[in-house]
Amino acid sequence: QPAPDAMVLDCGCGGGANIKTLLKLCPNGKVQGIDYSAVSVEKTRKINARAIAAGRCTVQQASVAELPFEAEQFDVVTAFETVYFWPELAQNFREVYRVLKPGGVFFICNEANGETTKDDKWTQIIDGMTIYTDTALKKYLEKAGFCQIQSHKNKKGWLCVTAQKL
């Protein structure tokens, strides 16, 4: 769980629900969100309008390939259900590493874990989707410089991975 005053970046913020939750977890912190989709950015801004007005949240259209932030700015970076669509995972993870503060944590959460037959169905119907196993994610994270990489799977197959920048 992030510290109450954490600076958090949510990559691929989608409809903004995770940002809303992160704002509650970090009542004295700030949460920034990016998404490649203009529609998602607008939805996220709508659902988090109060936090934006209070200066606790910003949301912008951007790509994880070139994060529009200074180096070492965030305590936590999250990616919920989004790394499936990142075009260059190794380079994208290096960008996340760049914007994390030393000691910062990257948190990835995916409904699909790359180890079930249902995962094949998704990649067949959704163009450009790649489902990664925990082993594959760990290799990419290590190449980007992350350490203390841990993965957890629940009974429903959700995969959560944490990685730290030292």
Q: Language-model segments: what does each one mean?
A:
Residues 1-7:
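Short helix-loop-beta connector
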Residues 4, 100-105:
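Short glycine-dipeptide loop
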Residues 76-89:
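A short SAM/SAH-binding and catalytic strip from SAM-dependent methyltransferases
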Residues 7-66:
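Class I SAM-dependent methyltransferase SAM/SAH-binding core
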Residues 105-162:
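C-terminal alpha-helical "lid/dimerization" subdomain adjacent to the S-adenosyl-L-methionine
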Residues 90-102:
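A short glycine-rich, Lys/Arg-flanked "PGG" loop and its adjoining helix->strand segment in the class I
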Residues 65-77:
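A short acidic, Gly/Pro-enriched loop at the edge of an enzyme's catalytic core
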